[in-house]
Curated annotation (Swiss-Prot):
Keyword terms: Amino-acid biosynthesis, Arginine biosynthesis, ATP-binding, Cytoplasm, Kinase, Nucleotide-binding, Transferase
Source organism phylogeny: Bacteria, Pseudomonadati, Pseudomonadota, Gammaproteobacteria, Pseudomonadales
Subcellular location: Cytoplasm
CDD domains for the chain: AAK_NAGK-C
Name of the protein this chain belongs to: Acetylglutamate kinase
Amino acid sequence: MTLSRDAAIQVAQVLSEALPYIRRFVGKTLVIKYGGNAMESDELKTGFARDIVLMKAVGIHPVVVHGGGPQIGDLLKRLSIESRFVDGMRVTDAQTMDVVEMVLGGQVNKDIVNLINRHGGSAIGLTGKDAGLIRAKKLKVTRQTPEMTQPEIIDIGQVGEVESVNTELLNMLVQGDFIPVIAPIGVGADGESYNINADLVAGKVAEALKAEKLMLLTNIAGLMDKEGRVLTGLSTEQVDALIADGTIYGGMLPKIRCALDAVQGGVTSAHIIDGRVPNAVLLEIFTDTGVGTLITNRQG
């Protein structure tokens, strides 16, 4: 393919802008939560795979954690198994857990691994059960109403939270030039499987690895103020204030709290980025403008 002169100049400008960022992040680990629209569009899937391969090629270490809620819901529907949710979490009985493992650990994980490898990477698929990668425990959910003297305990089945991450395994893979692709399934002390929110797994993996960045792909342009303007850079204190005044609410809260926990736990920065934008990951890392919201532990 021969580029026109103008196109060649544009490519050179892009590379020139990216070079300082490449130098800054060489040898660093970035944890990317992959989900939403970015997993559904063929164009976006291809762009994501190329982004990941390029990062590895220039010496950055990406670790991918993926979701798969819509795919789980589709298979449950085809199997005539009812999907039930409590506070946004899928109630996961033994039958549903079998489907979760089949979809996340099988179909979705292997599709992502295959796509990255087709574009020149060396991805390796994992669930949290492999070598005890994600040790988990049952998530306790309670509900309190004014008329209750004690909180109601709600059993949502095999839904878990992360207790620990096998960083030795991940570091071995990363240093061996592999790209880990992790399905958010944890394993309990008794060998029980647990369905865990992918954002939470990504956050805990980033925290355990002391990653440079945690990047959460979403279906929005980033965090917005009450006038609908994207907030491109925030400190943890500013995010806390936006939660307190109701600017951040609803379904975005768990994602933001995950980002806050990661940054306060040693991750240099967390990013809420627009996964609907082609090459969103590269744009956020390697350009001055980015495509989302950057959260750090620094003021301003």
